[in-house]
């Protein structure tokens, strides 16, 4: 009887402690709302061409991580099919930033023809051109290829959140923003925040695994959203 009573008292005590912790957390959260994001403002010079934001970018991004009102999307591929090594870049996702989840732009829709031509003039060939959720026509209209296309897009890029986009140089993020705005999103809530090469803060995670001269990639570290096109219903 005494053991049972002691057990009950112990359980009640821990319940009170946990309820107190939850109450304090809730009170703190309610009394410390997240600060407003700065209004979008394009950077100057070359960064303006890539539509990189002046206020939220690779130099300031660590100040805006872990926000509950924001989703973070890296729109690079794990292994890009294009010959980026001809520009002294890499095809593989060598590192990413904590809190960002990878959703490749290349699986959302096609690359604009002018971009393909531009890259060809820079000796970069082989951009991904296979299955995509949407088709991009010459008039920049986005036509869904699958019954589930819009549902997937809205899940990955929710309407009720701010969206931070990043990629390797700015173009993939730029194209993603154009697509979202053309379909259903508020342009003022979508930020092209930087190109990863200039990131120098504290939340970078490397995927490179180098043993002597042999390099492999720990893609298992990456929070990656795979789109299984074989399971989707074609229109």
Stretch-by-stretch model annotation:
Residues 4-62, 66-67, 71, 78-235:
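Rhodanese-like catalytic fold shared by cysteine-dependent sulfurtransferases
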């Amino acid at each position: 009887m005494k053991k049972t009573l002691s057990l009950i008292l112990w359980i009640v005590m821990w319940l009170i402690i946990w309820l107190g912790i939850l109450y304090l957390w809730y009170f703190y959260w309610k009394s410390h709302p997240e600060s407003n994001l700065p209004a979008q403002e394009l950077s100057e010079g070359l960064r303006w061409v890539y539509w990189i934001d002046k206020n939220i970018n690779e130099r300031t991004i660590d100040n805006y991580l872990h926000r509950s009102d924001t989703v973070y999307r890296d729109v690079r591929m794990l292994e890009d099919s294009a010959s980026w090594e001809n520009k002294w870049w890499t095809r593989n996702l060598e590192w990413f930033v904590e809190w960002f989840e990878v959703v490749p732009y290349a699986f959302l829709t096609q690359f604009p023809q002018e971009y393909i031509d531009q890259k060809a003039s820079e000796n970069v060939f082989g951009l991904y051109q296979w299955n995509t959720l949407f088709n991009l026509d010459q008039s920049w209209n986005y036509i869904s290829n699958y019954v589930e296309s819009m549902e997937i897009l809205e899940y990955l890029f929710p309407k009720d959140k701010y969206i931070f986009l990043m990629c390797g140089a700015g173009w993939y993020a730029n194209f993603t923003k154009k697509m979202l705005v053309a379909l259903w999103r508020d342009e003022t809530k979508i930020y092209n925040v930087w190109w990863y090469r200039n990131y120098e803060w504290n939340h970078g995670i490397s995927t490179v695994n180098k043993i002597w001269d042999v390099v492999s990639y720990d893609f298992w570290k990456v929070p990656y959203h795979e789109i299984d096109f074989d399971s989707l219903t074609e229109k």
